């Protein structure tokens, strides 16, 4: 199995999600099932079936997160060679060559990606175009509406 790259922040978020599922959701669902069973006939007990369905989902999510945690490779961007190259974990400021607008993204793992927080997946078209390039380079991003040319203004190595 391949390692899954993740930032230290992303690893902590996954660990927190797992802890919440195990320590909050799982016990609550067990209690919901116990209460629903007390209502009698389980064949037509909607509360029981809903709780069992939620239990199945939560247990599946726990297994999924545990697998990811066992396979993840935490990358501390502050310990990387700070040579101005775009790599996993770096925060990159770009300038659109058409309208000179600036945008800043951090390249993160799949589970951490959130465009509303300017965090893009390392597998996204933008990140793929940026990886390995350095400050001052121009990159072409293959987008659904056509190619976009960006100039890399800065590459920062912080968490």
From Swiss-Prot:
It holds the Pfam family GreA_GreB. GO terms for molecular function: DNA binding; RNA polymerase binding. SUPFAM superfamilies: FKBP-like, GreA transcript cleavage protein, N-terminal domain. Keywords: Coiled coil, DNA-binding, Transcription, Transcription regulation. Necessary for efficient RNA polymerase transcription elongation past template-encoded arresting sites. The arresting sites in DNA have the property of trapping a certain fraction of elongating RNA polymerases that pass through, resulting in locked ternary complexes. Cleavage of the nascent transcript by cleavage factors such as GreA or GreB allows the resumption of elongation from the new 3'terminus. GreA releases sequences of 2 to 3 nucleotides. NCBIfam families: greA, PRK00226.1-2, PRK00226.1-4, PRK00226.1-5. Belongs to the GreA/GreB family. This is Transcription elongation factor GreA. It comes from Vesicomyosocius okutanii subsp. Calyptogena okutanii (strain HA).
